Amino acid sequence: MMSLTFMAGLIFPVFMMLKGINPMSLLLALLTLSLCAVLWLGSFMSSWYAYILFIVYIGGILVLFIYVCMISSNYIASQHMYKSLLYAWGAVMLMSLTMETDTFIILGSNMMYTSVNIPMTILIFLSIYLLIVFFAVVNLMVNMTSILMVESSQV
């Protein structure tokens, strides 16, 4: 159950990034994402690895905060976070269904009943998570009012 909570904490900021145009909301989503990822990783691996990763995340967040303060400080915050909450709730429900299921493995003519292997479940979750983050970044790049917009004259 604790793993499910950390996974929900990883997915919610990604959906916040999909709706967030304000750089400060993106900064908050990135901070939440990094904190949940480090807590989740610290529960599976060595806590020293999680500490080092958190320090790297905080360094990146500080660079982003300096960028926000100097370049784009006059954005208005978005009020459409209810859809993000709905998406995050749906993702948590989907994960809770897939985490507790068992699978059938067919070996030759015998059908053997085994439980889902935990590392495979983590690998599937991380690949889905990477896909969602990819869609969030693409959505930010396509949005015309986004910070990450690349102008054709600069390329």
Curated annotation (Swiss-Prot):
Keywords: Electron transport, Membrane, Mitochondrion, NAD, Respiratory chain, Translocase, Transmembrane, Transmembrane helix, Transport, Ubiquinone
GO cellular component: mitochondrial membrane
Ranges in coiled-coil conformation: none
Catalytic activity, as annotated: a ubiquinone + NADH + 5 H(+)(in) = a ubiquinol + NAD(+) + 4 H(+)(out)
GO molecular function annotations of the record: NADH dehydrogenase (ubiquinone) activity
Keyword Membrane in record: yes
UniProt keyword NAD present: yes
Membrane topology listed for this record: Multi-pass membrane protein
Highest taxon in the source lineage: Eukaryota
TM stretches of this protein: 24-44, 51-71, 88-108, 118-138
EC identifiers of the protein: 7.1.1.2
Cellular localization per UniProt: Mitochondrion membrane
Protein purpose: Core subunit of the mitochondrial membrane respiratory chain NADH dehydrogenase (Complex I) that is believed to belong to the minimal assembly required for catalysis. Complex I functions in the transfer of electrons from NADH to the respiratory chain. The immediate electron acceptor for the enzyme is believed to be ubiquinone.
Family: Belongs to the complex I subunit 6 family.
Protein name: NADH-ubiquinone oxidoreductase chain 6
Name of the gene: ND6
